[in-house]
């Protein structure tokens, strides 16, 4: 029985690892969005050719927690050369409310910060798959290499996961 448990555990770990690799190889959705400054943008296009970090919120609560990630990434000298975009998914919000939501997001943000904050209103399921969303109340983070390949993903508190992001970015450099 003990050897069965070892073999079963090894097979389970292998299958989880292979499933994870399939997710990392997946292409980013080519969804058109808009920055808070009003510029039309396709994230898959603008991040291609250089390393980038995407920090996404898929709910109000997740979006509020994403701000802590942005602060920590910008304060970390090891991540200084990496382009960072904050992403808010508003597909579920009624269209007549989206303008008010975006107005609230803009408050207290400089024009430069607004240029790096992307609002998406379609393809939510594709983005949830890309980020590996399980709990939309968490912020989700992806590190993407210059070829557009996802090399690290995480979700949760920045204080817990930022060292992993930094290590992944350092390995990629």
Per-segment meaning from a language model:
Residues 1-7:
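Positively charged n-region of N-terminal signal peptides that target proteins for export
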Residues 9-21:
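Bacterial N-terminal signal peptides
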Residues 22-44, 114:
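N-terminal "domain-start" segment that seeds a small globular fold
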Residues 46-66:
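Short active-site neighborhood of thiol/selenol oxidoreductases, capturing the structured segment around
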Residues 59-62, 90-94, 124-126, 149-150, ...:
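Solvent-exposed loop/turn segments at secondary-structure junctions
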Residues 62-110:
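Structural microenvironment flanking redox-active thiols in thiol-disulfide oxidoreductases
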Residues 85-87, 100-136:
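Short, internal strand/loop/helix patches
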Residues 128-129, 137-173:
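Thiol-/selenol-based redox modules, centered on thioredoxin-like
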């Amino acid at each position: 029985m003990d050897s069965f448990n070892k073999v079963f555990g090894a097979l389970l770990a292998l299958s989880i690892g292979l499933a994870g690799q399939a997710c990392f190889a997946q292409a980013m959705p080519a969804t058109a969005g808009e920055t808070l400054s009003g510029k039309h943008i396709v994230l898959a296009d603008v991040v291609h050719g250089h390393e980038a970090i995407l920090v996404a919120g898929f709910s109000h609560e997740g979006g509020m927690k994403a701000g802590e990630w942005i602060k920590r990434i910008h304060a970390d000298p090891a991540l200084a050369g990496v382009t960072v975009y904050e992403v808010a998914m508003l597909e579920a919000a009624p269209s007549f409310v989206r303008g008010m939501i975006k107005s609230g997001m803009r408050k207290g943000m400089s024009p430069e910060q607004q240029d790096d904050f992307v609002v998406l209103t379609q393809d939510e399921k594709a983005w949830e798959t890309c980020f590996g969303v399980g709990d939309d109340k968490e912020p989700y983070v992806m590190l993407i290499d210059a070829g557009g390949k996802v090399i690290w993903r995480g979700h949760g508190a920045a204080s817990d996961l930022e060292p992993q992001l930094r290590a992944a970015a350092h390995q990629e450099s």
